[in-house]
């Protein structure tokens, strides 16, 4: 049953990648912040020569692909680390994607993703920080949703913070202590609590935090993180943005979930291989609507290269010995 459920999850995801209803995102202004001060060690150990943020996903650098489904904002701020492999190449590629891209380079490691994001936000001029919402996201996943659903939540003045969540992700059921979990009021999208690295109930059905958060005001993000740090709320020695949602609640902010329809993760070599396997399969299967050329995430100039990579091959028969 689990295998069938996983197949359906991927089939639905790739149907949506080819569906025009999922082909746009809301425009909200403000800032997108992508903390990516890690070193991508798992990919290095697997022999990847390209730094993790530049590893191709559908023909585009992973860090660029991760922003494709986020609300359109006036600025994209990527938070990097000085000693990360390929720093100069990463900055060059990111800045070439858009004049709205800025990079913040930290001099060394921090005590967690939340601190890295806070430092990135603080590096933005104060006048710009005050303008528009702040969306924070990871550099190694994407999410599919109907734009009107997110727009309705963004337009609701009763929404201070949005936590992007997903249900039914197979790896969450297999490795529940790798994820953040959200508790909501019964039958509501209003968040009542967060559990980081500890599942709340049924990991196969409960919502996981995807790593994307939208704050109506960037100052609320800073207040929540600073409160979390003041109470030393570390998980495994690090400060997580997931955890600061508890502080947002304590500050009286209205926190709501936005459940995306498909969660696409490329965070580990196995995650990326799995995504590429299903992309190759569905593109080849006549009975499935997905085609590479109809996927807006696929770089047009890389289409031929992807087809070559995914070309059908016949396995070599083993030698027979009498």
What do the PLM-derived regions correspond to, one by one?
Residues 2-32, 206-321:
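Conserved alpha/beta core of the MobA/IspD/sugar-nucleotide pyrophosphorylase nucleotidyltransferase superfamily
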Residues 4, 108-113, 169-172, 263-266:
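A short acidic, often aromatic-flanked loop/helix-cap motif at beta-alpha or helix-coil junctions
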Residues 53, 100-102, 190, 254-256:
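Conserved beta-strand segments of alpha/beta enzyme cores
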Residues 118-119, 149-152, 244, 274:
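Alpha-helical elements of Rossmann-like donor-binding domains used by nucleotide-donor carbohydrate transfer enzymes
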Residues 138-142:
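The conserved acidic donor/metal-binding loop of glycosyltransferases
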Residues 143-232, 310-311:
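Conserved core of the sugar-phosphate nucleotidyltransferase
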């Amino acid at each position: 049953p689990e295998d069938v459920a996983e197949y359906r999850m991927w089939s639905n995801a790739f149907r949506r990648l080819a569906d025009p209803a999922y082909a746009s995102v809301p425009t909200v202004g403000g800032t997108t912040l992508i903390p990516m001060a890690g070193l991508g060690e798992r990919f290095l150990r697997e022999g990847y020569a390209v730094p993790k943020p530049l590893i191709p996903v559908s023909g585009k650098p992973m860090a660029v692909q991760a922003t494709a489904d986020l609300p359109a904002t006036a600025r994209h701020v990527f938070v990097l680390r000085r000693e990360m492999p390929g720093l100069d190449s990463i900055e060059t590629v990111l800045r070439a994607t858009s004049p709205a891209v800025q990079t913040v380079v930290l001099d060394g490691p921090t005590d967690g993703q939340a601190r890295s994001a806070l430092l990135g936000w603080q590096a933005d001029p104060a006048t710009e920080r005050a303008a528009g919402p702040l969306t924070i996201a990871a550099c190694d996943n994407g999410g599919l949703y109907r734009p009107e659903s997110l727009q309705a939540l963004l337009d609701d003045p009763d929404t201070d913070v949005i936590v992007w969540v997903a249900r039914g992700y197979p790896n969450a059921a297999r490795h529940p202590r790798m994820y953040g979990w959200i508790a909501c009021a019964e039958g509501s999208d209003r968040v009542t609590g967060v559990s980081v690295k500890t599942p709340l109930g049924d990991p196969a059905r409960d919502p996981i935090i995807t790593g994307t958060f939208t704050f109506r005001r960037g100052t609320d993000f800073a207040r929540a993180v600073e409160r979390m740090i003041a109470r030393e709320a570390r998980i495994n020695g690090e400060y997580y943005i997931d955890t600061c949602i508890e502080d947002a609640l304590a500050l009286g902010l209205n926190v709501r979930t936005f459940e995306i329809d498909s969660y696409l993760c490329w965070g580990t070599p196995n995650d990326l291989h799995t995504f590429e396997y299903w992309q190759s399969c569905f593109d080849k299967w006549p009975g499935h609507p997905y085609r590479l050329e109809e996927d807006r995430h696929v770089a047009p100039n890389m289409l031929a290269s992807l087809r070559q990579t995914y070309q059908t091959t016949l396995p070599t028969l083993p030698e027979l010995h009498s």
